Regions:
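Class I S-adenosyl-L-methionine
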Residues: 145-179
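Conserved beta-strand signature within the Rossmann-like core of class I S-adenosyl-L-methionine
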Residues: 133-140
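SAM-dependent Rossmann-like transferase core, predominantly class I methyltransferases
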Residues: 1-39
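A short glycine-rich, Lys/Arg-flanked "PGG" loop and its adjoining helix->strand segment in the class I
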Residues: 120-132
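Short beta->alpha hinge that forms the Motif I/post-I loop of the SAM-binding pocket
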Residues: 69-73, 118, 141
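Glycine-rich phosphate-binding "P-loop"
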Residues: 105-117
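Short "lid" loop at the C-terminus of a central beta-strand within the Rossmann-like core
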Residues: 112-114, 141-146
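Conserved SAM/SAH cofactor-binding pocket of Class I
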Residues: 24-108
């Protein structure tokens, strides 16, 4: 996979999101998201084969990068891809993340197809882990509810801004409101 600032290899497999290629939503996030801080705790929620987690680890080698996915094959692939690219990524099942863990940065192409209620629960859980100055960068397909999700996040008192749009995707920045 080649990005403007990085080149790395990764393996995908059937049964894991975006088998055989980097999906256009994730590519948009990786190309357009603001540069991550040099350090902190970063999470890729719904990591799939790990392109987001690997990018975070390569761009911010001093950060603690955690890749989370309920799919065991996705976790295996992410761990193998991190090893192959010589980066440090902690790969875990969501149930094994410590309840008190706070996060400075979330990058995610969240699993929209799990359904509206399940997605809202997932986002409520992970956004609730953001540190006071933490930020989540989410890429959402416009045709799969990006604008309604944006409105819902605002009604839940999150500060949301659209960082960009491309090829039917929205790139959103989500953070805690500050007085």
């Amino acid at each position: 996979m080649v990005l403007p600032d990085l080149a790395f290899t990764f393996t995908t497999d059937r049964g894991v999101f975006s088998h055989g290629h980097l999906d256009s939503g994730t590519a948009f996030l990786l190309q357009q998201a603001p540069s991550p801080p040099t350090e902190g705790t970063f999470v890729d929620v719904g990591c799939g084969a790990g392109p987001i987690a690997l990018t975070l680890a390569l761009r911010s080698p001093e950060a603690t990068v955690v890749a989370v996915d309920p799919n065991s094959r996705a976790r295996e692939l992410t761990a193998a891809n991190a090893t192959a690219n010589e980066v440090s990524v902690t790969v875990v099942h969501p149930d094994n993340v410590p309840a008190d863990m706070t996060v400075d940065l979330i990058w995610s192409n969240p699993p929209i197809r799990i359904g509206k209620q399940a997605l809202r629960e997932l986002l409520t859980e992970w956004l609730g882990r953001l540190s006071d100055h933490g930020v989540a960068i989410l890429v959402i397909n416009r045709n799969l509810g990006a604008d309604s999700l944006h409105r819902w996040l605002e009604t839940e008192s999150w500060h949301v801004s659209r960082l960009g749009s491309r090829s039917g995707f929205r790139l959103l920045s989500v953070s805690r409101p500050h007085d």
